[in-house]
Amino acid sequence: MKKMSARQQQILDFIKDEVRAKGYPPSVREIGEAVGLASSSTVHGHLDRLEKRGLIRRDKTKPRAIEILTDDMPTMEEQESVMYVPVIGKVTAGTPITAIENVEEHFPLPAHIVGSDNVYMLSVSGDSMINAGILDGDRVLVRQQSTADNGEIVVAMTEEGEATVKRIYKEASKVRLQPENDELEAMYFDNVSILGKVIGVYRTIH
């Protein structure tokens, strides 16, 4: 068999480093960024060749499902403790914007944290929820449900078809969406649709 190329070795080493550091393999996009390949098809080609060499094994029905076939790496069964949560659109936690109802990617999280298949993540921009510890650029973990108690943080769709992250309060004749920022005022609506309850926040420290 032809000798493994330097680029293939670079990709293999990067996958190993990511699995050791994070407990799960990188995405195709992350591999490309790490080794300087802009084309995802080129990355897939290198992964195919690594798989033919018996160095990795992939489950193409699942995102990021790459197993390194060496004794010092976690097996695919051990990696099954990770759940791949869909990241859906982008919700503004300041001025609401129309929600984009498509899955942008799948994000790996420990299964014991997620606890349910009925969850998704949303990226947040704006500072209206800073007092609740939700900052600009965070991703919120949301459990899909159509009801919530007063004071809970939810993803709510307004009458105008816009989505926002706020605390919800059902008052006598209106629904109040309350920001967690002393400089911002509450928003009032006749009706809103609850798209889910926020159960966690993910933040990357740069």
UniProtKB/Swiss-Prot annotation:
Represses a number of genes involved in the response to DNA damage (SOS response), including recA and lexA. In the presence of single-stranded DNA, RecA interacts with LexA causing an autocatalytic cleavage which disrupts the DNA-binding part of LexA, leading to derepression of the SOS regulon and eventually DNA repair. Keywords: Autocatalytic cleavage, DNA damage, DNA repair, DNA replication, DNA-binding, Hydrolase, Repressor, SOS response, Transcription, Transcription regulation. Residues 28-48 bind DNA. Homodimer. The gene is lexA. InterPro entries: ArsR-like_HTH, LexA, LexA-like, LexA/Signal_pep-like_sf, LexA_DNA-bd_dom, LexA_repressor, Peptidase_S24_LexA, Peptidase_S24_S26A/B/C. Its EC number is 3.4.21.88. It comes from the Bacteria. Pfam families: LexA_DNA_bind, Peptidase_S24. It is an enzyme of class 3 (hydrolase). The record marks A93, G94 as: Cleavage. PANTHER family: LEXA REPRESSOR, LEXA REPRESSOR-RELATED. GO terms for biological process: DNA repair; DNA replication; negative regulation of DNA-templated transcription; proteolysis; SOS response. This is LexA repressor. Belongs to the peptidase S24 family. The keyword DNA repair applies. It catalyses: Hydrolysis of Ala-|-Gly bond in repressor LexA.
